[in-house]
Amino acid sequence: MLPLYLLTNAKGQQMQIELKNGEIIQGILTNVDNWMNLTLSNVTEYSEESAINSEDNAESSKAVKLNEIYIRGTFIKFIKLQDNIIDKVKQQINSNNNSNSNGPGHKRYYNNRDSNNNRGNYNRRNNNNGNSNRRPYSQNRQYNNSNSSNINNSINSINSNNQNMNNGLGGSVQHHFNSSSPQKVEF
């Protein structure tokens, strides 16, 4: 059982909390949020020294009584619960589950990812949905290769004309001229 889940179901129970600075707070839990920030009522707060010494000593006068206190979850060192609180929470959860499942209009909603034998295939599309217009991508691939030989021939002629430009001395400028209309380039 997760600590946050335990605390949310333990509202109304007496508990003792030690903070990171050594203070001890005793009270009744009234509210818990997702960051484990607590609100306690009927609170007694003890400083570090009075918690260490016995209650018969004069140091016990450092105890402070408060109606309510709010404690940030980041300041909590540990929480001491009553011995039987886990059993009470389990009984409370079971009684809530039994009362909710027998009510009228009760439906259980399951995660649809696990249905239709698609376990583990969450990102795959099911193309067998009865829609004949949808085909897998591989069946729709068609290439127009009629001009590919002409393109390859022109690329080869450009590369053979410009091989003397690429002499390994760094970058070079390659000019592509049409043989039917010669052009002059001045540098």
Curated annotation (Swiss-Prot):
One of its GO terms (molecular function) is U6 snRNA binding. Residues 112-167 have a biased composition (Low complexity). Residues 2-85 form the Sm domain. Pfam families: LSM. One of its GO terms (biological process) is cellular response to glucose starvation. Keywords: Cytoplasm, Methylation, mRNA processing, mRNA splicing, Nucleus, Phosphoprotein, Ribonucleoprotein, RNA-binding, rRNA processing, Spliceosome, tRNA processing. One of its GO terms (cellular component) is U6 snRNP. CDD domains: LSm4. The modification Omega-N-methylarginine is found at R119. InterPro entries: Lsm4, LSm4/Sm_D1/D3, LSM_dom_sf, Sm, Sm_dom_euk/arc. It comes from the Eukaryota. Residues 93-187 are annotated as: Disordered. Coiled coil: none annotated. Residues 175-187 have a biased composition (Polar residues). Component of the heptameric LSM1-LSM7 complex that forms a seven-membered ring structure with a donut shape. The LSm subunits are arranged in the order LSM1, LSM2, LSM3, LSM6, LSM5, LSM7 and LSM4. Except for LSM1, where a C-terminal helix crosses the ring structure to form additional interactions with LSM3 and LSM6, each subunit interacts only with its two neighboring subunits. The LSM1-LSM7 complex interacts with PAT1; within the complex PAT1 has direct interactions with LSM2 and LSM3. The LSM1-LSM7 complex interacts with XRN1. Component of LSm protein complexes, which are involved in RNA processing and may function in a chaperone-like manner. Component of the cytoplasmic LSM1-LSM7 complex which is involved in mRNA degradation by activating the decapping step. Together with PAT1, the LSM1-LSM7 complex binds to osmotic stress-activated mRNAs to attenuate the osmotic stress response, probably by limiting ribosome access to the mRNA and consequently translation. Component of the nuclear LSM2-LSM8 complex, which is involved in spliceosome assembly. Present with 3440 molecules/cell in log phase SD medium. This is LSM complex subunit LSM4. It comes from Saccharomyces cerevisiae (strain ATCC 204508 / S288c) (Baker's yeast). The gene is LSM4.
